[in-house]
Amino acid sequence: MADLDDIKDGKDFHTDKPQTNTLFSLKGCGALDWGMQSRLARIFNPRTRKTVMLAFDHGYFQGPTTGLERIDINIAPLFEYADVLMCTRGILRSVVPPAINKPVVLRASGANSILTELSNEAVAVAMDDAVRLNSCAAAAQVYIGSEHEHQSIKNIIQLIDAGLRVGMPIMAVTGVGKDMARDQRYFSLATRIAAEMGAQIIKTYYVDKGFERIAAGCPVPIVIAGGKKLPEREALEMCYQAIDQGASGVDMGRNIFQSEDPVAMIKAVHAVVHHNETAERAYELFLSEKG
């Protein structure tokens, strides 16, 4: 029982000052629960509202592709330079050190391979396991215009509903149907559908014409995929243009871990995303950091 004689009555309540609570201002997150906003504040830098995600989840359908043969040797040295790690639960448990203390976006869709129809995915992770792994978000593909469009949208809806119950953001990743053009009209459609379903983050591709319309028409943050390996200067230009036109960050894999110098490249990408460096300045940084 409390010692009532030792309880001192409070005196300084600062009655002349209204109570404040610093809000985490991120596009589309104002009505989200505290836990979900807290996870998003780990993914997106609270100062810049941007993020540099390092994607190395490719093995879930590609196997040990170039650069991902040994995650512990090729990818682990990059962890400290990334804001966020995007990977599968298998790699997270077997390779990623728990003490790295980086937010994780967990790949939560799968059940396909490059030998089959890529759009034929299922939810591959239960939400309680994503929570058990201390993930900050879960991610799944959505294939608008593909043979399995309906199933991929159902997968996203299932994850969103499960995520809302536990405060877990969901990132919808826009895969491209075989017969769909990679243009502004398609990605405006795909990103908007995913956001309308309730995804809190959208990962999509940058397009040269009309990307600002894609970003403006999507009510939640967009991060761009790196896509196929480009020359470093071109990849940095893509990053710069995407950020300049409304993207909230990048989720890059091959353009970092297949670079001539992956550490130098992720540092250059960070300079573009968080410090508004031009592609030219960032490429100069890449060359100066290159071993």
UniProtKB/Swiss-Prot annotation:
Gene3D superfamilies: Aldolase class I
Keyword Transferase among UniProt keywords: yes
Entry keywords, A to Z: Cytoplasm, Schiff base, Transferase
EC nos: 2.3.1.245
Record localization: Cytoplasm
Example of a GO cellular component annotation carried by this entry: cytoplasm
Main location: cytoplasm
Active-site residues, as the UniProt record annotates them: K203
Reaction it catalyzes: dihydroxyacetone phosphate + acetyl-CoA = 3-hydroxy-2,4-dioxopentyl phosphate + CoA
Lipid metabolism in keyword set: no
Subunit structure: Homodecamer.
PANTHER family reported in the protein's UniProt record: 3-HYDROXY-5-PHOSPHONOOXYPENTANE-2,4-DIONE THIOLASE, FRUCTOSE-BISPHOSPHATE ALDOLASE CLASS 1
Family: Belongs to the DeoC/FbaB aldolase family.
Designated name of the protein: 3-hydroxy-5-phosphonooxypentane-2,4-dione thiolase
Organism: Salmonella typhi
